[in-house]
């Protein structure tokens, strides 16, 4: 039975895809048969044939070296670098939760450890027409616990605590925090980490520095964060 985790962030451009690549790479190198999944990707380039290249998936695939097909990584790929609900309104098709679930099941049937990345932060709207679907609806539907990705620098305390408190109020379990763009020995960043841990009660799972190609975390400890998925 496959195991899964959801990767959310305190906002856009926090580095979730980069962290996802590190997680998948770490598991792959430990022989865990990992995979990657994302409900919707925005801001993608077109191939010469006019089709859209799922950029986040392409990065994770190349960075981690996994053999998973790009087509299986994301059911909804948009060109505009907008929130998925808006990109879908202009480009179509709108996101269908059952399609997302079906894609997730398909990946989980073929791989052992599946990392699902969110779009933006946990409050990101995926569809906003006759139906209202937010990212948290996907997380609840799939029954996934989450890892929170945050910046190590100035302003992160507020963003981390707000996200953690919101997820707690919504019944969305968090396993811990990974801090990106960390500078060892930086007084402010070290205090940021300590304050975030104190104010949220969440463990710091790892810190990631610019250009890291390996996660400073034991592969077995990482694998233990993933929980059995309910298909």
Please tell me what each predicted stretch does.
Residues 14-15:
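Conserved glycine(s) of the Walker
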Residues 4, 18-94, 98, 103-106:
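N-terminal phosphate/diphosphate-binding loop that engages ATP/GTP or pyrophosphate donors
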């Amino acid at each position: 039975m496959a195991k899964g985790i959801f990767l959310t962030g305190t906002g856009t451009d926090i580095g979730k895809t980069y962290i996802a690549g590190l997680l998948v790479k770490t598991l792959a190198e430990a022989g865990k048969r990992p995979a990657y999944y994302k409900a919707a990707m925005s801001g993608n380039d077109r191939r010469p044939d006019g089709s859209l290249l799922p950029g986040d998936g392409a990065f994770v695939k190349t960075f981690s070296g996994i053999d998973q097909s790009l087509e299986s990584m994301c059911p909804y790929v948009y060109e505009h670098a907008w929130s998925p609900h808006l990109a879908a309104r202009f480009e179509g098709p709108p996101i269908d939760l059952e399609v997302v679930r079906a894609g997730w099941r398909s990946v989980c049937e073929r791989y052992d450890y599946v990392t699902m990345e969110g779009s933006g932060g946990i409050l990101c709207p995926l569809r906003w027409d006759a139906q209202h679907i937010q990212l948290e609806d996907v997380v609840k539907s799939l029954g996934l616990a989450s890892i929170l990705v945050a910046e190590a620098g100035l302003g992160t305390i507020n963003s981390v605590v707000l996200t953690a408190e919101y997820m707690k109020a919504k019944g969305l379990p968090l396993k811990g925090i990974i801090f990106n763009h960390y500078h060892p020995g930086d007084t402010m960043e070290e205090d940021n980490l300590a304050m975030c841990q104190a104010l949220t009660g969440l463990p710091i799972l790892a810190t990631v520095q610019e250009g890291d190609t390996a996660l400073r975390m034991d592969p077995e400890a990482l694998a233990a964060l993933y929980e059995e998925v309910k298909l």
